């Protein structure tokens, strides 16, 4: 539920509302690209804050200890307030609001992920941690359906921002008791007998490649995730089903997270990560090959299916490689993901500016995104050979 608020509303409500804002004349496509980048820049800033928090706190001993549940609560409240703020008729303030919403999203994501994965590790059920990543999918479905209904009712974007802000507070109230007083997330110690998988070296190079490959996923999906409703309108003008492609993406996210949580993984997660990238690349390819109702629907589903599964597997890899500093390195990986997201929208704006039509610009943007995802998948396959896994006993 917390991730549904922070990600489904705080980050992704902008996507289904973008056509409404364009229709109302309060924004144009180049401005929308930069507004999206402001949110992703905030996401990067929040992730970096999580990354360097242990370093800062170690050098400033007077700072109070970080309380994970309190950070989650603060992020949820900030998300609701900042979403409501987008209804204000102050376009000059919108980039700052979206930036701050990105910071809040990153804080909630990192601390919720660390808390849940730590709890599941203690219960010796790490795969069940993937259930939390159904939250963004549920949030995307709900926000997409709400936006579709508001379009049919001829509401304005300002009304939609108010609705989503109120919805964020309602959902936050439901999950509020879960994050009461509790311990700050800590990496779980291995316990019990048996065997675990470990690569032959846990050096900085391996972690660096993982973070870069994960960052590529941020770039690869963001073009479609930000502009899907606009791309669909350019390809299928007048269709009554245009507003359903985004909820279909969210449904794929939801289902993919459930599937990932039920997989009995006994092999290398990097192989699953490569497969996720290939699936997302295929989703983009379907839309390019068949820009039709069926093509966009199938493409949206394929793009969404591995979306949070990629995050789940990548965060598990981070915990495997750096168990003692999991939260910090989760922040680093999330920061790389944020950099990938930041690059996407300005690239779209650049390609649109140098294309004969919006459709041609979006096509070129999607081709670049697909190529990036394929490159990321190949990186994981290369890592499989560079750092093969071996079984080690744990006690």
Language-model regions, residue ranges each:
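Cytoplasmic helix-loop-helix junction between adjacent transmembrane helices
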Residues: 99-135
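Paired small-residue
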Residues: 92-101, 294-302
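Helix-to-loop junctions at the C-terminal end of transmembrane segments
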Residues: 46-67, 256-268, 352
């Amino acid at each position: 539920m917390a991730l549904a608020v922070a990600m489904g509303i705080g980050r992704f409500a902008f996507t289904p509302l973008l056509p409404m804002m364009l229709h109302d004349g309060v924004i144009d496509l180049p401005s929308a690209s930069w507004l999206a980048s402001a949110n992703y820049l905030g996401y990067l800033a929040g992730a970096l804050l999580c990354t360097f928090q242990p370093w800062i706190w170690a050098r400033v001993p007077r700072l109070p200890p970080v309380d994970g549940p309190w950070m989650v609560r603060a992020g949820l409240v900030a998300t609701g307030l900042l979403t409501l703020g987008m209804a204000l008729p102050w376009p000059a303030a919108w980039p700052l609001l979206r930036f701050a919403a990105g910071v809040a999203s990153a804080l909630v994501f990192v601390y919720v992920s660390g808390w849940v994965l730590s709890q599941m590790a203690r219960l010796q059920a790490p795969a069940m941690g993937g259930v939390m990543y159904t939250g963004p999918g549920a949030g995307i479905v709900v926000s997409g359906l709400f936006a579709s209904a508001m379009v049919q009712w001829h509401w304005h974007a300002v009304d939609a921002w108010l609705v989503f802000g109120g919805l964020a507070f309602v959902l936050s109230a439901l999950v509020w008791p879960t994050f009461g007083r509790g311990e700050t997330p800590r990496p779980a110690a291995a316990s019990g007998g048996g065997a675990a998988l470990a690569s032959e070296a846990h050096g900085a190079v391996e972690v660096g490649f993982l973070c870069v490959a994960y960052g590529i996923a941020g770039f690869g999906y963001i073009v479609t995730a930000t502009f899907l409703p606009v791309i669909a309108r350019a390809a299928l003008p007048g269709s009554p089903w245009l507003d359903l492609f985004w909820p279909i993406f969210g449904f794929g996210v939801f289902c993919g997270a459930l599937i990932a949580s039920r997989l009995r993984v006994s092999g290398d997660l990097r192989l699953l990560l490569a497969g996720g990238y290939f699936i997302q690349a295929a989703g983009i390819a379907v839309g390019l090959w068949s820009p039709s109702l069926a093509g966009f629907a199938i493409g949206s589903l394929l793009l969404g299916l591995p979306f949070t599964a990629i995050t789940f597997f990548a965060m598990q890899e981070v915990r495997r490689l750096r168990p003692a500093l999991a939260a910090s390195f989760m922040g680093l990986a999330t920061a790389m993901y944020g950099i990938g997201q930041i690059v996407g929208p300005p690239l779209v704006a650049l390609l649109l500016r140098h294309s004969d039509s919006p459709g041609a610009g979006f096509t070129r943007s999607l081709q670049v995104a697909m190529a990036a995802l394929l490159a990321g998948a190949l990186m994981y396959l290369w890592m499989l050979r560079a750092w093969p896994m071996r079984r080690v006993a744990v006690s």
